[in-house]
Regions:
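Helix-coil boundary and interhelical linker segments in multi-pass alpha-helical membrane proteins
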Residues: 1-6, 59-73, 122-135, 189-192
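Structural signature of hydrophobic alpha-helical transmembrane segments
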Residues: 5-19, 69-84, 135-148
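Hydrophobic core segments of alpha-helical transmembrane domains in multi-pass membrane transport
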Residues: 8, 15, 46, 51-52, ...
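Generic transmembrane alpha-helix signature in multi-pass membrane proteins
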Residues: 23-31, 90-96, 106-108, 115-128
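C-terminal ends of transmembrane helices
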Residues: 24-38, 86-100, 152-163
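Cytoplasmic-side transmembrane-helix entry/capping segments in multi-pass membrane proteins
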Residues: 37-48, 72-78, 100-111, 165-173
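Ordered, amphipathic secondary-structure segments that act as subunit-interaction surfaces
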Residues: 62-104
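C-terminal transmembrane helix-loop-helix hairpin of multi-pass membrane proteins
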Residues: 131-192
Length: 192
């Protein structure tokens, strides 16, 4: 049965959100989500890297790895592609927006090892999507990641102004907030 683009988009953004349902990309989700602006920048960078990696990894898998019978090299090849794309994003951000480059700090190079980027590239191949379906899947998954990141950052900014018991301040309240956000996203599970 052919997967519709609408189902891919809704499923990737809301139902199977890469962070809140599949638990991929937790490190940047917790690390960069203290401010909405930083979260938006990280979301944009991840979206750009995922979109480019979708095209490049699909082409490499389809036209090089499978014909040569070296599918076992998939993970290594995908990591190299993602690393090269992240370096490109880092160079562009450093020139275009030095403030965002500074705000993202160590998390920008960590996109290379962000399991969400690699995991989505591998899932795209496992689901046997066409190039266009894979691109839609990767971009919508990245948008879902960015949406969760920005919502979570907004919640964390509001929590800073509230009085929480000492035991819950910092990471504990962030994890509780993330779990409530994940439960809220579970409400979308009947959509697709």
């Amino acid at each position: 049965m052919e997967t519709t683009y609408f189902a891919i988009i809704i499923g990737s953004i809301f139902v199977n959100n890469v962070v809140l349902a599949q638990f991929l990309g937790i490190c940047p989700f917790l690390g960069v989500s203290s401010k909405v602006e930083t979260s938006m920048g990280m979301g944009a960078a991840v979206t750009f890297v995922m979109a480019l990696s979708a095209v490049v990894t699909w082409l490499l898998q389809t036209y090089i790895l499978v014909p040569l019978g070296i599918e076992y090299m998939q993970t290594i090849v995908f990591i190299l592609v993602i690393a090269a794309l992240v370096q490109m994003v880092e160079i562009v951000l450093k020139k275009v927006s030095p403030s965002l480059y500074q705000a993202l700090g160590i998390f920008l190079p960590l996109i290379t090892t962000n399991c969400a980027v690699l995991g989505v590239a591998i899932l795209m191949i496992q689901k046997e999507f066409t190039l266009l379906q894979g691109l839609v899947y990767n971009v919508s998954t990245a948008l879902g990641f960015a949406l969760a990141l920005v919502i979570f950052a907004g919640l964390r900014e509001r929590i800073e102004f509230e009085e929480a018991p000492k035991a819950f301040q910092g990471v504990p309240i962030a994890l509780i907030t993330a779990s409530i956000l994940a439960m809220a996203f579970m409400g979308f599970s009947g959509l697709v």
